[in-house]
Every structure is written in structure tokens, then in C-alpha cells.
Amino acid sequence: MSHSDTARIHAGATVAPSAILGDFVVVYPGADVGADCRVRGYTQLWPGVRLEAGAELGPGVTLEAPESPESGNAGDSIVIGPQARVGAGALICRGVRLGQGAVVAAGAVVAQNVPPYAVVTGSPARITDYVQNTSGAPVMAWHQRATFPEQPSVVPLGVGGVTLHRFKFLQDPRGDLSVGEFSREIPFTPSRYFLVMNVPSDKNRGEHAHRECQQFLVCVKGTCSVVVDDLEQRCEIQLDSPDLGVYLPPMTWGIQYKYSSDAVLMVFASHYYDAADYIRDYDEFVIEKRAALAKEQA
């Protein structure tokens, strides 16, 4: 265990040997600091606070104390997920959970749960980005310079089987037209569709995966951003034209956010609605996806 001489660990606290505690960090009974965590200094870890493996708190981070430390109310507990990072001077309110890989900007005030790999800023904190390890910028550049049909109309995003599609767009004095064909350009025949609209700019949609259902997304009006994640790679793409669509195969975690005020997102689905087909918890998605990958490699 590595920690400053001014750090204090109370009896009943759990601190992994590989954790690093900075100046004037106090870990109270019932707090749990996981492997490879780092708390840089001037932070109190109250009873019930849990830092999961690899989490990092910058200097002067404030974790709101539970209303009654003796009550053991799990709803008051703060959980900082694996590899999550919290910037200097941020405030995390009681009961908040930061998902795996989430990033909290310096000085942010976080009063709501933060999804895995989301980047939040401001007071109150709002999602402004997602951590990516694959960039969609080259694909967007292709879309902006391509002239249909001189260049390919389907481009892989580098995230599993996710693909970006560009359709015919015809300009006419009577009104413009964009057209695509199912089972030819769109890789399945839909069983249903739905429209998403009137989404506040600070809200997210999606945040789930499907076990069997395939989806195809087109922002027919306005703009929105789509984050796709297959556990190995993660990428964000902006849908900003009615001739642009993105295909999500099964077992792809999908998020839609950054909706413009006039955005209308059309989603085609290969299956009828089935609540059992949804995976709404990212930790559950990780478990099932890893099992599926292991089965493929066996």
C-alpha cells in the first residue's frame, strides 16, 4: 500500500495494497478502495463509498457525506466505477454512481448517475462527450466528399459489424428525395419502426443493447450523435443528413445524444418489440458480450 504520511485509514475501511492515497485523504469505516485506485489528496471517503479497480480522484474532490453514516442506507452510497476519473475540485453528490470509464471534468457538480464512458462537465454536470478509442472522423470526411454512386455507399466504422451507409439523394425543384432499399442497402427487412423526437438537448436515448434485434438509424431531420460500443472498440458518429444511416448489429451497445431541437430520429428494427431482448445494464452487457466472444474464439 502506498499513501501519504498525512493520509488516514480508519479501522473497518478496506484499501487494496496497490491503491495510492495522497495528502490528507481520510478513509472512514465501511469505505472500500479497490485495486490500483488513486486518490490524489484532500478527499474524505465516507462510509459506503466504493472506488472500483483503477478509479482515480483528482485533488480536492468532494464526495457528499451520507445523511446518517450510521444508517447504512445503500441509497446514499457513492460508487466510482472501474477506471472512472474525477477531476480536481469536482463534487459528487450522495447516491451517485459513475459508470466504468466515466470522466468527470474538474469543478463539475454531479447529482445524477453517469453512464459508462460518458464525459460530464459543468454545474449541474451534463454529458458533453463519450470516451472513444476509434474515431468516426475519417468516415464523416468520406461522407462529406463522396458523390453517389462514384464511391462506396457502405463504410465500416471499426466497431464490430457497425457500418455507415450513404443513400441516393436527389435534388428536385419539386422537393428533394432520399431513398434506400431493405435487404439490399439496409441489411435486413424491418418488422417495426419508431420515431424519436422532441428530445431535450441534455438528455440521452438508447443506452442499451439487443441480444437478437438489428437496428438501422437515420436522422431524417436535424442532427444527433450515435455512440456505438462492441466492448473492444467505441466510436461516436454524427447523423446530420437524411441520406446518412448507421447499422447496429445485435450485441452492440448504442447511445443517442446531442439532439438538435428539431431532430427526428427514425429507427428500423428487425424484430418485434420484446423486453427480454434488451440489455439495459452495461455490466450485464460486458458479461454477455465477453461470453459470446469467448464462444466465437473457442
What are the roles of these predicted feature ranges?
Residues 140-244, 261-262, 268, 273-283, ...:
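Non-catalytic, conserved peripheral segments adjacent to functional cores
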Residues 2-98, 123-124, 130-136:
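Flexible, glycine/small-residue-enriched loop-and-beta-strand segment within the central core
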Residues 16, 52, 115, 249-250:
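Proline-anchored loop/turn motifs at beta-strand termini and strand-loop-strand connectors
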Residues 67, 114, 124, 131, ...:
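Residues at the C-termini of beta-strands that transition into short coil/loop
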Residues 61-63, 110, 222-227:
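Short beta-strand segments in beta-sandwich/barrel cores
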Residues 42, 106-109, 113, 239-260:
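Conserved metal-binding segment of the jelly-roll/cupin
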Residues 122, 248, 268:
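A conserved hydrophobic position in a structured secondary element of the catalytic/binding core
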